[in-house]
Structures are given as C-alpha cells and as structure tokens.
C-alpha cells in the first residue's frame, strides 16, 4: 500500500523561535580547540594549522576500511570515483587526524548527500542532480559492500577518503537487507553512529510508505525490482524534503533522539487531557472500542501538547518523528477546514502492517492526530475529532496555550543557549531553536562521552570543551552533562570562568528546570 492522501489541509506558517546569539566571530578566524574533562581535571590543547579556515579538533571517530581492500578493488574505486567526485582514496593511514578537516563547512553547500539503493544495486533515491553519476556511484558502492559481506562476512559501516586539499569525505552505510543506504559526509562533527541513525530515519520513512512485508514480497518476487518508480510522487517529494533537512537544516529532535513539548501551564494541559479522556470514554460506551489507538495534540510546529495512548504501549520516538515530517511537509499548502487521511507503517511499532492517521488543524492552532488500526474508521475518527474540537471551542482554557517563560539570559547571564533532555519521557526543552553552528558544537560535546556505537561511555559523566578564538580575547565554552535521568548541553560565550563556576551555573540551571518540569514536559499523558 502506497501513501495517497484522500483529503488535504492547510494552515498558516508559524514563526519558529530563533536565537540572537552570534557565534560567527568564533567560526571565521583561526583558533584552537581546548578539551577539559571536569571530572579528572585533565586538559588537552591542540593548535590549529596556519590555514585560517581550519579549526582543530582533538578526536577522530572515522573508521577507514581501505586497508582491507585488495589491489584490484582499490584501483576500481579510485579510478571510478575520481571520474564522479574529485577525491582520492587514502591508502596510507587509517586514523588520519581530523585536524586536517574543516571544523565547519564554509563553502555554503551541503556537506551531506543521501543515497538509497536496493540489494541489486538499483538506485531508489539520490540527492545528486545528475542521476547517471549517482547510479554509477551506487553501483561501485554496491560492489564494495558485497566484497565485505562475501570475504569478511561483516557489514561495512564506513570508509574514508581524502581530497588533494586534505578535506576528508566519509561514506557511511546502513544495510537493511533489501535496502542499502549511504550518506556521503564532508563534516567531522557527526560520528558514524549518528550518521547511521539518520540513515535509519530515512529507512523508516520508506517503510512508513511501503511496509516491510510488502517490500519483502516485491524484492523476493523480483530482486531487481524498481522501487524508485513504485514510490508515489508524494513519497519521493517527502523523501527529498527529509534528506534536504538532514543535510542543511537538521532538527534538534533528531540530534537528541527525542520529542519537544510546548511549554504551557499545567492547568491548560490538564484541561486538554480531560477533554481527550472524557471524549474517548464516550466513544467506548458507544461501542467504538478499539477504533482509536493513539491521539496526539501538537502545536503547528509539532511540539507535543497532549497524548492519549494505551497504558501498556507507547509509540517509538522515531515513528512519531516520521509522522510529524509527513504532516509538516503538507501543512503549508493544505486547506485549514479539511482533514488528511492516510495509511502509515510505523517501523518501530509494527513494520509489517499499516495504521491509519487522521489529521486536522483546530481553530486554536493545534493539530489533532488520531491513529487507528481500522482502514474504514475515517468516519468514526472524524466524529471523535469533531467532538474534541467543539469542547475545546467551548473551553476558553484551551486558547493561547503557549506559556512565555522567564528570560533565561537575565537569570543565567553566562549561558547563551542550552538543551535539557529528560530521559524518562524522551522529551527535550530549549529556550530557542539552536542554529546549525550551535548544533555542530553540541555534536562535538556529545562525541566526547560516546563510543563508536553511540552509547554513553559512563552512566554519569561531565565534559567540557573550550574553543579559543585568536581574533578576540574570549572563549566559547561548552558543557555536556549526562546522567541516567537527564542530558544537559550548555554553550557559554566570551567568558573566562573557572570550571567550578561553570559547573555551579549548570547545577543551578538543572535545579530551576526541575522546579518547573510540569510546565515543560508531559509526564504521562492520558492512558486507557
């Protein structure tokens, strides 16, 4: 079953919060990266090369596979890739330092390109404009991946290449049996595990449209099946939009593998919870039991307001991220007074079957998302949404939901930006959406405390980075604090504080967030 919406909706664009912090001074001049481990007090400093475009890093997560290739395969890759992409395969060292790479890509173009192809090497999707070149590259990569599977019986995760200018390009892979995914990446701040997680998100989107069961049937029936032309135009459009966002405007929820909630007063959130609960109970009494599996209420920018779910089931974060992307991509051009109805397969929930989603924008600028297992449940779900809409209109508490919290800069003048993640609920809070440059700093902080599989090295750890800028006297400091209960990322700009003072500010911030948790997060939602 392929996604083909029956109805359409639209809404006005909502302004997304932005930050006024200017970090460009720290990115344009030659500098060095200082790593400090607060727990141990050790400090390491690496000076950048004389190239003003380079900013040094102290660690490298690249995994080079070229030493395992035989001479013929090396020759094939080098000659063929040079005709497609001006790079040479490094055959001398497998741990070349990331110091020779650009810390932040200043060329203005995308530093990531995503590719999807079948187990037979047939191209499904590419961000390259020249499809012939993309097909040639995927054919080569298909050969390389098969080489490792046959000779080493191991899945290839990544290989690294270096251009004549010393810039590193990584090719990271994810093998999903019938589907192979690859990302060509020119940055050094995302680890292999993080890039593979992005590939898994792309794969989850494909499964959301096709389902694993249907994909298996198609590929087993004909191994060289053309999946590219099986996907609808809408599928291709949404897949392109997702990959473009991953490459140029990555979302904070992807970075933190979490969901973001709308800050609001507990009274307003409880009012919406009560409406969902009473309406659902009314439907059960009316013999509609089992028709409604999940109900989500979000803001127009996909921040969670409330959720209705079974007491023994929760939807995986990645499944919800895919659902939000499908809705987000169609939100701008659709009509407000109509609804969207489409099938969707949640890979992490049940990758063999479809659920059915009804989406509607309500007058108070919230989005209702109702999910059912029944293909013919549209009328029932539509009536369910109508009743909720009527109750929200009658209840003034359900208007003007977002709560404007205090000015964080006044309470914490040294903190320019932060991200707080509550692990139990897999939800995050940030006072404003980080810029791409900020996310790159956060990636560097996170990588210090994770292994090559993306797992935290310790149950509890605190790490600090300081980026020195020779053009100005200040330092840009970053703190990453991870425990079993939370993760905290902080950026502090142009200050010269001691580690103890910075850590004290972090503790005060955590204490304040815990005092207002009921405003920031959904603790449980409505269960049945």
From Swiss-Prot:
An individual GO BP term: autophagy
Keywords from the UniProt entry: Autophagy, Endosome, Membrane, Protein transport, Transport, Vacuole
Keyword match Ion transport: no
Cited Pfam families: Fuz_longin_1 (PF19036), Fuz_longin_2 (PF19037), Fuz_longin_3 (PF19038)
Superkingdom classification of source: Eukaryota
Membrane-topology descriptor: Peripheral membrane protein
Compartments reported by the entry: Endosome, Multivesicular body membrane; Prevacuolar compartment membrane; Vacuole membrane
Signal peptide residue numbers: none
One GO CC term, this protein: fungal-type vacuole membrane
Chief subcellular location: membrane
Function: In complex with CCZ1, is required for multiple vacuole delivery pathways including the cytoplasm to vacuole transport (Cvt), autophagy, pexophagy and endocytosis. The MON1-CCZ1 complex acts at the fusion of vesicles with the vacuole, through its regulation of the SNARE complex during the coordinated priming and docking stages of fusion, and particularly at the stage of tethering/docking.
Protein family per UniProt: Belongs to the MON1/SAND family.
Listed name of the protein: Vacuolar fusion protein MON1
Organism: Kluyveromyces lactis (strain ATCC 8585 / CBS 2359 / DSM 70799 / NBRC 1267 / NRRL Y-1140 / WM37)
């Amino acid at each position: 079953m392929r996604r083909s919406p029956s109805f359409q909706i639209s809404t006005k664009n909502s302004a997304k919060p932005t930050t006024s912090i200017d970090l460009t001074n720290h990115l344009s001049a030659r500098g060095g990266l200082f790593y400090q481990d607060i727990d141990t007090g050790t400090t390491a400093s690496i000076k950048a090369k004389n190239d003003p475009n380079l900013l040094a890093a102290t660690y490298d997560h690249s995994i080079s596979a070229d030493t395992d290739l035989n001479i013929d395969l090396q020759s094939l890759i080098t000659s063929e890739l040079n005709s497609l992409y001006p790079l040479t395969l490094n055959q001398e060292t497998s741990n070349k330092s990331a110091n020779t790479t650009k810390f932040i890509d200043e060329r203005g173009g995308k530093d990531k390109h995503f590719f999807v192809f079948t187990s037979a090497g047939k191209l499904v999707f590419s961000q390259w404009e020249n499809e012939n070149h993309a097909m040639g590259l995927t054919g080569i990569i298909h050969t390389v991946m098969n080489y490792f599977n046959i000779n080493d019986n191991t899945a290839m995760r990544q290989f690294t290449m270096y251009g004549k200018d010393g810039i590193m390009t990584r090719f990271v892979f994810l093998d999903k049996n019938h589907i192979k995914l690859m990302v060509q990446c020119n940055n050094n701040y995302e680890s292999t595990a993080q890039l593979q997680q992005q590939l898994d998100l792309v794969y989850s989107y494909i499964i959301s449209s096709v389902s694993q069961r249907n994909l298996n049937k198609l590929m087993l029936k004909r191994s060289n099946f053309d999946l590219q032309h099986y996907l609808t135009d809408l599928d291709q459009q949404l897949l392109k939009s997702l990959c473009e966002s991953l490459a140029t405007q990555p979302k904070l929820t992807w970075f933190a593998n979490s969901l973001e909630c709308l800050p609001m007063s507990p009274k307003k959130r409880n009012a919406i919870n009560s409406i969902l609960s009473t309406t659902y109970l009314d439907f059960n009494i009316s013999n509609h039991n089992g028709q409604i599996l999940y109900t989500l209420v979000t803001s127009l920018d996909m921040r969670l307001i409330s959720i209705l779910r079974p007491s023994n089931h929760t939807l995986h974060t990645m499944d919800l991220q895919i659902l939000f992307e499908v809705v987000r991509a169609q939100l701008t051009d659709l009509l407000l007074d109509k609804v969207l109805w489409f099938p969707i397969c949640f890979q992490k929930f049940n990758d063999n079957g479809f659920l059915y989603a009804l989406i509607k924008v309500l007058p108070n600028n919230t989005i209702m998302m109702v999910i059912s297992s029944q293909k013919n449940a549209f009328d029932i779900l539509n009536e369910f949404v109508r009743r909720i809409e009527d109750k929200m209109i009658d209840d003034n508490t359900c208007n003007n939901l977002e709560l404007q919290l205090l000015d964080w800069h006044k309470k914490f003048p040294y903190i320019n930006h932060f991200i707080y993640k509550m692990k139990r609920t897999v939800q995050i809070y940030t006072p404003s959406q980080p810029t791409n440059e900020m996310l790159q700093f956060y990636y560097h902080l996170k990588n210090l405390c994770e292994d090559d599989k993306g797992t935290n090295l310790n149950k509890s750890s605190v790490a600090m980075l300081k980026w020195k800028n020779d053009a100005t006297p200040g330092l840009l400091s970053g703190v990453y604090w991870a425990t079993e209960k939370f993760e905290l990322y902080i950026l502090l700009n142009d200050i010269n504080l001691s580690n103890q003072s910075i850590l004290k500010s972090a503790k005060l911030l955590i204490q304040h967030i815990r005092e207002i948790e009921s405003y920031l997060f959904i603790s449980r939602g409505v269960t049945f």
